[in-house]
Amino acid sequence: MTINAARELRDGQVCLVGVGPPNAAANLARRLHAPECVLVYESGAIGAQPVRLPLSIGDDDLAATSLELVSVVEMFNFWIGGGRIDVGFLGAAQIDRHANLNTTAIGPYEQPKVRLPGAGGAPEIAACAKSVIVIARHSPRTFVEKLDFVTSLGHQRGHTAVITDLGVLRPADDGELELVAVHPGVEPDQVREATGWDLRMAPELDHTPPVTEHELTQLRELRASAGR
């Protein structure tokens, strides 16, 4: 999942990096094929070039290796709100058929079963980035018919990729997600059964390329570097 998400990034793109799997995927892309990808963190790090996997958006390695550090106000007003982010890399606890995301709460907001980390900058990133990549594990608990809380609105222009451990989803012309590719060894019915709505299939279903040994080695080294 992380490797397939990393493959979505292109060299030279300005990428705003979320926490968790998006963080690993973006840094992996820089190691593999996009060394000139500009990593931006909402804490204010511009052009971060961390030598290890950052533990959070406040990791001191980001400050030490960034080309520039800006205030949170400048980050949200100039960089995100100003449309200067090519790709927003996000995670989600829940996602619906229109790629709306929930990172706030599971269950009623007033008395949730689980209180999630919250919005952070995700709503602004989802609304203002030129494209959005979402990483999530594929299960009926995550891919739901109705979100418990709408944190971030789906990217209605269609420039969205949802990368899961089973395949790749992208919006059709009407904005509804459809399965466009499955990973090696995965059958389309597996993906449909792991989705909380009647998932559409693209007319010509593709298969993602197998993961290479080089990609796996780089990912293992990146994960092993965390916290050093």
Residues covered by each model-derived region:
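N-terminal charge/polar-biased segments
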Residues: 1, 7, 205-228
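N-terminal active-site beta-alpha-beta segment that forms phosphate/nucleotide-binding
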Residues: 1-66
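Structural signal for hydrophobic packing residues in well-ordered secondary-structure cores
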Residues: 9, 13, 29, 33, ...
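Charge-rich, low-complexity amphipathic helices
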Residues: 27-31, 47, 51, 101-102, ...
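Conserved phosphate- and dinucleotide-binding cores of soluble alpha/beta proteins
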Residues: 53-214
